[in-house]
Design a protein with these regions (language model features):
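Nucleotide-sugar donor-binding/catalytic module of glycosyltransferases
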Residues: 1-113
């Protein structure tokens, strides 16, 4: 049986502190577990850094990057995350969104066809 491919999950954030924990938990609790989580913050001013720092020692979190200055450009954040990604697949998971816990379990096999 083939090993499950690694999925790199990039979470770009700017001032979404109120959603961050739920978003990150909706990723970490996926039924598909071969993931790396890349957390990015674009110089938030709402305390998002505190939430992200709670995950710094989590085994699934490969990177937490905190910008000192806001880029004003989400595409720069996406690109930064893609450069860090080691997975076969990359999922840009916006910070103010949620997903079903079976999302990756359903999507990865379709991409593998």
């Amino acid at each position: 049986m083939n090993a499950l491919p690694l999925v790199s999950v990039v979470v770009p954030n700017y001032n979404y502190k109120r959603y961050l924990n739920l978003r990150i938990q909706s990723i970490l609790q996926q039924t598909y577990q071969n993931i790396e989580l890349i957390l990015l913050d674009d110089a938030s001013t709402d305390g998002s850094e505190e939430v992200l720092s709670d995950y710094q020692n989590h085994a699934k979190v490969s990177h937490i990057l905190l910008n000192e200055h806001n880029t004003g450009n989400p595409f720069k954040q996406w690109f930064k995350g893609m450069q860090l990604a080691k997975g076969k697949y990359i999922w840009i998971a916006e910070a103010d969104d949620l997903c079903e816990l079976t999302f990756l379990e359903k999507v990865v096999p379709l991409m593998e066809k």
